[in-house]
Amino acid sequence: MSQTQDYECRSHNVDLPESRIPGSNTRLEWVEIIEPRTRERMYANLVTGECVWDPPAGVRIKRTSENQWWELFDPNTSRFYYYNASTQRTVWHRPQGCDIIPLAKLQTLKQNTESPRASAESSPGRGSSVSREGSTSSSLEPEPDTEKAQELPARAGRPAAFGTVKEDSGSSSPPGVFLEKDYEIYRDYSADGQLLHYRTSSLRWNSGAKERMLIKVADREPSFLAAQGNGYAPDGPPGVRSRRPSGSQHSPSLQTFAPEADGTIFFPERRPSPFLKRAELPGSSSPLLAQPRKPSGDSQPSSPRYGYEPPLYEEPPVEYQAPIYDEPPMDVQFEAGGGYQAGSPQRSPGRKPRPFLQPNKQGPPSPCQQLVLTKQKCPERFLSLEYSPAGKEYVRQLVYVEQAGSSPKLRAGPRHKYAPNPGGGSYSLQPSPCLLRDQRLGVKSGDYSTMEGPELRHSQPPTPLPQAQEDAMSWSSQQDTLSSTGYSPGTRKRKSRKPSLCQATSATPTEGPGDLLVEQPLAEEQPPCGTSLAPVKRAEGEAEGARGAAEPFLAQARLAWEAQQAHFHMKQRSSWDSQQDGSGYESDGALPLPMPGPVVRAFSEDEALAQQENRHWRRGTFEKLGFPQILLEKSVSVQTNLASPEPYLHPSQSEDLAACAQFESSRQSRSGVPSSSCVFPTFTLRKPSSETDIENWASKHFNKHTQGLFRRKVSIANMLAWSSESIKKPMIVTSDRHVKKEACELFKLIQMYMGDRRAKADPLHVALEVATKGWSVQGLRDELYIQLCRQTTENFRLESLARGWELMAICLAFFPPTPKFHSYLEGYIYRHMDPVNDTKGVAISTYAKYCYHKLQKAALTGAKKGLKKPNVEEIRHAKNAVFSPSMFGSALQEVMGMQRERYPERQLPWVQTRLSEEVLALNGDQTEGIFRVPGDIDEVNALKLQVDQWKVPTGLEDPHVPASLLKLWYRELEEPLIPHEFYEQCIAHYDSPEAAVAVVHALPRINRMVLCYLIRFLQVFVQPANVAVTKMDVSNLAMVMAPNCLRCQSDDPRVIFENTRKEMSFLRVLIQHLDTSFMEGVL
């Protein structure tokens, strides 16, 4: 599956009118649109109606600007309205003198092809004419077997100005409808007008972090929670199954009701949801019909993409606040060996709520009926749960359940846990006290291996299973769906239990994103286990009513689980290395951590299809998905590299060569393609996989920032966007008081350099202070780089944006980030290397390429050496080096190109000949330990600065300084002096003078000339008279110079050790036998 196929929304075969830029005759086919809150870019073709996430190649794209307005259409008033994504203004009248992007054409396209079934499914509380608050539209992609209208991708989290709730079509404010979903979309609205959910049919939600749904935790649940995992239409014959063409593009966990052969369509019977049902007020049979909607003025902007913003709705009272779960809230287990699942809610055609557990009037109550959730005696415990910093920040604002304080059903009851029962199908209800665990600790007893909300499953001791059956039958073990061990950030590495055969097969009538594929063979779905479907149905009928009592807990746990599942699932999809059929995804497919409050990710069919595409992934996959610490901190063995996407497995400087080799060998065996990711034995960079690398890292390491009188929490998205305000505490959590103080001052200095704050000192001195702070205090480095990433994100002041990238380039010239943040900074820089990101007057791609190069180099060399702090000259040189490349670290051809204007007649690099002459001029051939004793590092740095300006100071006294700089120049060449393609020949002929000389003459001309000049230079030092003084014979010289001419590409320490000896021998043979007389007088 190609990336374009996966990310674009295909349109119906309807021609759209041609669009042109106002005031221009240029035909406008592709335009860039930026969602106002999440700042996600998408590209729409106004001719074909195609929408893609990645910029199309080879076409002109109209960049977004403050002068861009979106033309939308309100079907209720039959009027066009206009929305400015930059200023977030919505007006009725057509703006003048600006670019109008006619997005309403896509609306018209949808309306012309909309299925009549959408109206058939409408019911009270689902008014199709009611606009959505927060504009919660998401991108939809039609299934391959259907012909649906194309929709413009949009995100959740629109500002209130972009969408407000309307009661009647005569509203005086512009509508909130951006683009409605096409082809059978069912919307639920709560009594106060909030969108509850969408139910979609024969459609896929588009992948990645670019689609969201706002789901009010109130009354009903989306169809992806109500889908029947066994593939049978409820109340229908068991032989009737919903059909879809098989293939990797179909979701293995979401049931789609596609048209049958006779044209009929099955819809699931809809029952009240135990997860998304709001506690009802006394005497109110339906919260949908009980209360009027809130006026539009009460609407608030929805939460941004990665946010920890406060919820859109008021937080419930403390005494009724449901706990934040990191495990399922209860497990109702029953006897009789049935495979009962409490988590398969459905909807009846009339959508009338049914009680979850109605008393059995004709028989004794079932064990499920005895479930009573009593009021928690220690409600304050729920608020004092100990979490790791990552887990607390992640879970704290994850889900809020709207509760009515007077509801008799609203009980804060004890939590229940699974109780393994070795007696086969016997179940029992075991309440347990509040489990106050630190998320950083592994779960011992009561560990929930499958985060399935209230679903009831066997908890028998695990039995051996074929891995394929494990993957197919377990919620958490299904290859890419979710490992509940990562349900909360602090507990991702806890060990999950493997389900037994009976346990897995009894879970077939489940619902939600972890369900089994409906197309799977029955033999795979239901291997012999001793249970039958009949007990399941009976138990289902007996236990329907515990849902009402446990609603608040179940809703919170279920929504948290859904969000976490989507997060882990999309993190797997973000792997840019192609899997099996080459359907890997590139850098815009990952999903960030869950949103706060009632904002919940929609688990889409498109997201679920990756489960089927990557069957070979195992249960342990998501236990290691959190950070690149897998290798950077050596927290686990490199043998687990298959359990994590490639970009999270960067070999670090502290990693041994054997681990790197093992990692690379397994990677090659997986992809079948050799990789150069471990060319250097210490560290190398790999293409980043996720747009949300920094956001994911930030969600676990950022401080909580608040704003305003009511101390509203600042979302991660806003914390990573440009700000003209100062910060009151560091962005990254730290316990170092000095770092806390310096971080706030550092942010002000960055603003001063970028021109966002008035400064008394000149910019160079401000940059010097910034670089000095980062160079001196290692704890400030990540803070500095995350602040620079923030100030260069969504910065529309071009001069400020250029200065921000310039300051990042300056800092990278002196010190790298810490290994923990290294890969995330790499991902941020990499995404800006495409020239499409360049704006008028700001060559962002040039800055990004330079920064990427410096970051790669800094990973190998570390921070600036020496005791002297950076000075103004070094700052000026680092600033100019962005557009005036240095002679150090460049290729030989580039060095020759730099000197072409100054020294057009030279055949050799000026820096090589000038430094060599300086060594001899300072009697280096009569200095003991020449080329072995290093020069003073501060003097070497100063000389390097001068040489890069085509100057050599006359006051040098120590020959070790130019000798050390000369070795540095050879060593830092972009490609080694003897290219890689000749390396094996050199190693093979290390003891043959004739063959070694032949290799030299086979080199490219510039390489041959430079190498011969070096050999002739070294031959001066091997003269017996000089060796007697320098103590550097031919073997010693070969030893110190060979690493500067040859580079071993192997990661095996044994190969490196053996080749080092051969490299020295090869260079010694050249010094002794290569005739360099033809280099006499050549410069």
Curated annotation (Swiss-Prot):
The record marks R932 as: Arginine finger. Residues 117-141 have a biased composition (Low complexity). Residues 890-1078 form the Rho-GAP domain. GO terms for biological process: postsynapse organization; regulation of small GTPase mediated signal transduction; signal transduction. One of its GO terms (cellular component) is cytoskeleton. Gene3D superfamilies: 2.20.70.10, MyTH4 domain (1.25.40.530), Rho GTPase activation protein (1.10.555.10). It is found in: Nucleus. Residues 722-879 form the MyTH4 domain. InterPro entries: MyTH4_dom, MyTH4_dom_sf, Rho_GTPase_activation_prot, RhoGAP_dom, WW_dom, WW_dom_sf. GO terms for molecular function: GTPase activator activity. The modification N-acetylserine is found at S2. Keywords: Acetylation, GTPase activation, Nucleus, Phosphoprotein, Repeat. Residues 110-154, 226-369, 405-545, 570-599 are annotated as: Disordered. Residues 25-58, 63-97 form the WW domain. Residues 245-256, 474-488, 573-582 have a biased composition (Polar residues). The modification Phosphoserine is found at S169, S286, S384, S388, S406, S407, S604, S690, S715, S726. Residues 268-280 have a biased composition (Basic and acidic residues). This is Rho GTPase-activating protein 39. It comes from Homo sapiens (Human). The gene is ARHGAP39.
